[in-house]
């Protein structure tokens, strides 16, 4: 039976959306979307609770122009073959252009990769490995990677211009951490009512393998109170490139909870406690009234809670945990430690 190790502080990290936590040895590494969307940052701590106060180091900044000059979103850190990789989405700066996308239009992001071959990701050099060629040019974001039976895979969100919707989820095998070894295979597209509230979205994939089953979580709908998580499941012995291997939940598995003031939970990652418990890491807001462009509201906070499993080894997703750390409601940006800048 899973341990019920407490998450003593929630939010885990203030004003950081799309959180990714990687536990490597006894160290937790944390990255997420910065509220200015102009950089990629990294923290580390010996405990999850230590991440809020941990030093935040900027390892990469947006370009002055070109395809990586605007709206840097959803970095994820991975360790593959002894090197460190960060997948992230970036777009060309359309500020001031007459044809700049509005809030109701699709953005123009692509997926990019950074590599660091040093033993310590806070040392060495982060090298740009460029854009991941997914096979076609359209809005693409939220790449994650996992290994199964010796093969590395990439899962990401991308728009198919031939179908209704802003983004579907795709999977492909990898030749190396920045190159696909085969064509993209669609795993899911927005089809259920909960996935199409505001926007037709499947995004933010994360993969967990537990007791012979793969759980591919994702988020759907617009990033307000309707934002929620769904899940695809497959046997770890099945072919992950075969859509028939996967079963999709018809209803969301993790949703807003007014009783604890946690709204729009999603874009999750998974990590573990030192005791071996699975930890669900996600972002959420603590209020529903958003003034202006939701992208300019910095108060999507990284949260974490132990994910228990039932006697059959299936996740009990539950509901967002209540807060134990004060969370801001103003649009004022905090210093990385959570204090007022």
Regions found by a protein language model. Give the residues of each.
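Carbohydrate-active catalytic/glycan-binding domains of CAZyme proteins
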Residues: 1-341
């Amino acid at each position: 039976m899973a341990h019920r190790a407490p998450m003593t502080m929630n939010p885990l990290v203030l004003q950081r959306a799309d959180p990714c936590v990687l536990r490597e040895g006894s160290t937790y590494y944390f990255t997420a979307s910065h509220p200015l969307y102009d950089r990629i940052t990294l923290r580390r701590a010996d405990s999850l609770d230590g991440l809020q106060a941990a030093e935040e180091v900027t390892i990469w900044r947006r370009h002055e122009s070109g395809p990586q000059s605007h709206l840097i979103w959803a970095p994820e850190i991975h360790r593959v073959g002894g090197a460190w990789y960060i997948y992230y989405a970036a777009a060309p700066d359309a500020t001031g252009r007459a044809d700049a996308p509005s809030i109701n239009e699709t953005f123009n992001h692509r997926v990019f990769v950074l590599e660091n071959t040093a033993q310590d990701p806070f040392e060495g050099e982060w090298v740009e490995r460029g854009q991941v060629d997914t096979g076609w040019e359209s809005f693409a974001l939220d790449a994650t990677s996992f290994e199964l039976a010796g093969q590395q895979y990439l899962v990401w969100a991308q728009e198919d211009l031939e179908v209704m919707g802003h983004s579907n989820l795709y999977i492909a095998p990898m030749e190396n951490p920045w190159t696909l070894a085969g064509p993209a295979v669609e795993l899911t597209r927005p089809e259920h009512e909960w996935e199409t509230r505001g926007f037709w979205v499947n995004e933010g994939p994360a993969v967990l393998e537990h007791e012979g089953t793969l759980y591919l979580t994702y988020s759907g709908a617009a990033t307000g109170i309707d934002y929620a998580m769904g899940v695809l499941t497959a046997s770890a012995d099945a072919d992950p490139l075969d859509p028939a291997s996967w079963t999709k939940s018809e209803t969301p598995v993790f949703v807003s909870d007014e009783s604890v003031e946690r709204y729009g939970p999603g874009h999750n990652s998974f990590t573990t406690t030192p005791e071996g418990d699975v930890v669900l890491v996600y972002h959420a807001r603590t209020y529903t009234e958003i003034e202006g462009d939701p992208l300019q509201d910095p108060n999507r906070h990284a949260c974490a809670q132990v994910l228990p499993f039932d006697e059959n080894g299936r996740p009990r997703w539950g509901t967002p945990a209540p807060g134990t750390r004060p969370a801001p409601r103003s649009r004022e940006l905090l210093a990385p430690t959570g204090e007022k800048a």
